Amino acid sequence: MTNIHNHKILILDFGSQYTQLIARRVREIGVYCELWAWDVTEEQIREFNPTGIILSGGPESTTEENSPRAPEYVFNAGVPVLGICYGMQTMAMQLGGLTETSDHREFGYASVDLQATDALFAKLNDNLTASEPKLDVWMSHGDKVTRLPQGFQVTGITPTCPIAAMSDESRRFYGVQFHPEVTHTKSGLELLTNFVVGICGCECKWTAENIIEDAVARIKEQVGDDEVILGLSGGVDSSVTALLLHRAIGKNLHCVFVDNGLLRLNEGDQVMEMFGDKFGLNIIRVNAEDRFLDALKGIDEPEAKRKTIGKVFVDVFDDESKKLTSVKWLAQGTIYPDVIESAASKTGKAHVIKSHHNVGGLPDYMKLGLVEPLRELFKDEVRKIGLALGLPAEMLNRHPFPGPGLGVRVLGEIKKEYCDLLRKADAIFIEELYKADWYYKVSQAFTVFLPVKSVGVMGDGRKYDWVVSLRAVETIDFMTAHWAHLPYDLLGKISNRIINEVNGISRVVYDVSGKPPATIEWE
């Protein structure tokens, strides 16, 4: 079996908003990497045994007395090191150079003139018409290196940054003041490939097929002949987790699908058809709609609704798990960003992956071992694995759907009538987006039920029914978002269909709020 962790890159996080992008780019190249806090110990680095190290950017200033520094062992480990932005500055400072706050801060696009073609910049040139090679890059820095450490040479400059890139090829140390991990840097992926593959010598073994093979082997080793229970929602993470476990242990996997009455139109039937009929999984469907709706009566505050939905789910799932007396393991679809965010919420830092770490917080009374086959993977990697396992692309690439489901898309108190109306209206919205080839042009689209009534006219009669709002946004990272400028004729068609086909809705509005100031979801 291929050892997909044999060659690996260690990324030390100094707090940049782009740090996870570095890891995703390295994985995209085909090499495993992990993201750790900047203040790891020498012992931890030795144990990880990286093939190369990348120092991320960060918001601090190296000119400040207590600003973060890389562990000294980083520069004594005998492996290549790449410093990005702040990572380059701390490398320079720690190896004997100088940095200072720049009079001309650089934020946004810049053109770097390459002064020397070292291994990092081999075959890179974004401007073939210029006499000297240039790179179009993305800058985001206020400090700059003003004196090189001994043994380094300048490899790139800009008009306001005399040391925009540097290298000491004898020690395989490299620094760039720009961000190769962002797509705005045209040749950024090629530069990172030069470092990871060309300089570090990593083999590209991190592929979907190899990841599946490794995950299946590790599941078999962990659980043996024991039985495992999994809460299957039909979402990407739990679906891929289910198929990996099914491939590893077959009928020893028990999937529990809790139909809470807060799902999209026909979603429960689709989950059963996909995983029960097509893939042959051992799946139990629990119709718990009444239980959820009863618990939600009289609750209109969003956070209280979320907590109630979460508690009822745990209670329902626990009831089912007690019926399966031979189960010894609980599987979860935890992914790598969950691990990073969980660690950060507790310590303010990203931490080392630790096996059997319970990100979600199991109730104390559920005495089960934990299986998390996706905990090393980013979302885009999970989707690639899902495709390789046979899941349809349209399912894997669906827009995000909140954990509480329609519970946070029905504003105020949740009632079955409201959910039924919303399901039908939302299905029409999504259907028309697909027909008009707009579904994949927007990042997320959904319908919100507003608990207010509005006067309308239907034929010769007057109607007084509910209002729904359409929401469609465009975003890269979901941290900020713009409302999608859908064509007026498309919006008109969607509105007309909803009002005419969904008895109980008299008015359709379109949400044109950005994030910020609004959030993407209404609750």
Curated annotation (Swiss-Prot):
Recorded catalytic reaction(s): these are:
XMP + L-glutamine + ATP + H2O = GMP + L-glutamate + AMP + diphosphate + 2 H(+)
Pathway involvement of the protein, from the record: Purine metabolism; GMP biosynthesis; GMP from XMP (L-Gln route): step 1/1
Keyword Endoplasmic reticulum in record: no
Q: List the disulfide bonds.
A: none
Q: Give me the residues that bind ATP, please.
A: S233, G234, G235, V236, D237, S238, S239
Please provide an example of a Pfam family that matches this protein in its UniProt record.
NAD_synthase
Pull one GO CC term from this UniProt entry. Answer: cytosol
Q: Which controlled-vocabulary keywords does the entry list?
A: ATP-binding, Glutamine amidotransferase, GMP biosynthesis, Ligase, Nucleotide-binding, Purine biosynthesis
Q: Where is the GMPS ATP-PPase domain?
A: 206-398
Residues in the active site?
Answer: C85, H179, E181
What the entry lists under InterPro entries is as follows: Class_I_gatase-like, GATASE, GMP_synth_C, GMP_synth_GATase, GMP_synthase, GMPS_ATP_PPase_dom, NAD/GMP_synthase, Rossmann-like_a/b/a_fold
- For this protein, the Enzyme Commission number is 6.3.5.2
Q: Which PROSITE patterns match?
A: GATASE_TYPE_1 (PS51273), GMPS_ATP_PPASE (PS51553)
| GO function term, MF aspect, one | GMP synthase activity
The answer to whether UniProt assigns keyword rRNA-binding to this entry is no
Q: Domain of life of the organism in this record?
A: Bacteria
Start and end residues of each Glutamine amidotransferase type-1 domain: 8-205
- Record function comment: Catalyzes the synthesis of GMP from XMP.
Subunit details: Homodimer.
> What is this protein's name?
GMP synthase [glutamine-hydrolyzing]
